[in-house]
Amino acid sequence: MSALRPPLIGSRSRNMNLKFRHKILLSACGVVVLAFALFTLYNDYLQRNTIRQNIEASVQQSGALTASSVQNWMSGRILVLENLAQDIGQQGAGDTLAGLIEQPSYTRNFLFTYLGQANGEFTQRPDAQMPAGYDPRQRPWYGAAANAGQTVLTAPYQGAVGGLMVTIATPVKSKRNGELIGVVGGDVTLDTLVEIINSVDFGGIGHAFLADANGQVIVSPNKDQVMKNLKDIYPGSNLRVAAGMQDVTLDGQDRIISFAPVAGLPSAQWYIGLSIDRDKAYAALSQFRTSAIIAMLIAVAAIAGLLGLLIPVLMSPLTTMGRAMRDIAEGEGDLTRRLAVQNKDEFGELATSFNRFVERIHASISEVSSATRLVHDLSEKVVSASNASIIGSEEQSMRTNSVAAAINELGAATQEIARNAADASQHASGASEQAHGGREVVEEAISAMTALSQRISESCAQIETLNASTDEIGKILDVIKGISQQTNLLALNAAIEAARAGEAGRGFAVVADEVRNLAHRTQESAEEIHRMITSLQVGSREAVHTMNTSQVSSEQTVQVANQAGERLASVTQRIGEIDGMNQSVATATEEQTAVVESLNLDITQINALNQQGVENLNETLRHCDQLAQQAGRLKQLVGSFRI
């Protein structure tokens, strides 16, 4: 808890540097600023709504009036043209047609008045030169009126002589049979509509314009916007030609747009658009904000001045009380002094509470003074007892260390015996395993020698059989030699007979000569085979003698190996007995080692506990010294108070 106090005090240092009168002054100014801010925001909200409602009402009224003016102007010309169509329908398109079209009521209201007949004839006043092959029936105004069967109004277009204009066209039907005579039309310039639109004034904060249902601007004070679409004029604004107020932005300027429909126009949907500068419309609101801020600053300055004069007067009792508390705190710690209570207000209650607090502190300090003396005496006694305990513990630690050293030596000797016994047992086990291995090797050698003796006997029999076979082969070779000799004689006789026969026996002589050569080679081969068989027979007899000698030696070796196997079995038995004794010794030694290690562990733990006890006593002694110092300090602090 004490570690958290410095940051807490530090975090409040900025507030503590301000005096209470300054805090009251700042709070009062803050309340005034907050009140004026809330009032300004609320009034701003009300005035904003009021201004928007007024703008909406004014826009609706102006839009309706302007739309009515446009409607009346266009309706008058439509009626004039429809009257012309009725007159032509009654009188027909004869010689009186030119006189009807040239009447002043038509020439004043239309730039051109004309009739396109069903037979392709075209009459226009004022008269003008038309292109060769001009057919009124192919013109859009003729087809639109004829198909609709009523008056139509074309889209605005740029005329050749009169600027921007529209065409009013209505069908002409005969009163006698109702057949279509043609279509009468009149070109109307929009200059009058421009004057009507430009006459709409909102006190310099906005203007009016005329647009169709597709958003194409027909009439506008800004000529750059004429015949352009609203989507191109206000890109990204999603402006719709519909009733209601819409907020858009043009060249970084916020504007309010509203539309009013122009009713009663045939085949056309026109709207009066009203564009108002938003900043100028809400200029009064900005002026009010500025006035409110100025009034707030004046009010804050006035309240700060008044409070600066009143607060010192109201705070005089608190100043007196603070001076008295400072005298008590900066004096000699005299707890017998009390504050004078002059009033029964909050400051009087504060002085009474302070006096009660000082009385409680006075009683507590008195009790602390007595307890401090008692704690100081007890701490000195505890220090003496701790010193005696430390001396006894150190003596006990020395004795315990001696016992631990002796047990460690005993444990080391026991471990050495256990290691030697384990090594002897391990060596005996190794010797036993080697003896077993030697016995197995001898037994395998005996088996191998026995098998070898048997194979030698079999080899002797096979060699004897081979010797007998070579004798038989020798006999066969003798027969072959005899046959070859006889063949040689027969070949010689055949050669002699062939010589006697002369030329007739020359071929037979050649054959006889070849037979003689073959018989000679056969005899030589038989002699060579006989020599080899003779040599083989000699080797076979020597091999038989050697095999017999080897068989006798192998039988003697088997007898010696059997005797060695019996001796190794006896050695293995004796080594096993020695191994068992070594294992018994090792087991007993290991048990003794475990007991010694247990004793050593107990002595070590006793020594550690003793050391811990000594450390605890030293720690207690240090704490007692600190307690004695704190008791002395507390005694000194208590002595600084006058009780």
Swiss-Prot record:
Residues 312-366 form the HAMP domain. Keywords: Cell membrane, Chemotaxis, Membrane, Methylation, Transducer, Transmembrane, Transmembrane helix. Disruption phenotype: Mutant shows different biofilm kinetics, reaching maximal biofilm formation earlier than wild type. Mutation does not affect the capacity to colonize the plant root. The keyword Oxidoreductase does not apply. One of its GO terms (biological process) is chemotaxis. It is a multi-pass membrane protein. The chain crosses the membrane at residues 24-44, 293-313. SUPFAM superfamilies: Methyl-accepting chemotaxis protein (MCP) signaling domain (SSF58104), Sensory domain-like (SSF103190). It is found in: Cell membrane. Chemotactic-signal transducers respond to changes in the concentration of attractants and repellents in the environment, transduce a signal from the outside to the inside of the cell, and facilitate sensory adaptation through the variation of the level of methylation. McpA is a chemoreceptor that binds to 12 different L-amino acids and mediates chemotaxis toward these amino acids. This is Methyl-accepting chemotaxis protein McpA. It comes from Pseudomonas putida (strain ATCC 47054 / DSM 6125 / CFBP 8728 / NCIMB 11950 / KT2440).
